[in-house]
């Protein structure tokens, strides 16, 4: 079992936010 460091949690959170942001922009572009 590997311990998750704070930096890994931060990177995962940022990447998730970027992915959701791009998904929303893509959805709006397709909707428009």
Swiss-Prot record:
BP term (GO), one: photosynthesis
Transmembrane segment boundaries: 9-31
One Gene Ontology term, aspect cellular component: photosystem I
Bilayer topology: Single-pass membrane protein
Subcellular location: Plastid, Chloroplast thylakoid membrane
InterPro entries: PSI_PsaM (IPR010010), PSI_PsaM_sf (IPR037279)
Principal localisation: plastid
Pfam families named among the record's database cross-references: PsaM
Keywords for the protein's UniProt record, in alphabetical order: Chloroplast, Membrane, Photosynthesis, Photosystem I, Plastid, Thylakoid, Transmembrane, Transmembrane helix
HAMAP family, per database record: PSI_PsaM
Family classification: Belongs to the PsaM family.
Protein's name according to its UniProt entry: Photosystem I reaction center subunit XII
UniProt gene name: psaM
């Amino acid at each position: 079992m590997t311990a998750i460091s704070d930096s890994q949690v931060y990177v995962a959170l940022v990447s998730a936010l970027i992915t959701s942001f791009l998904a929303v922009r893509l959805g709006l572009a397709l909707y428009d």
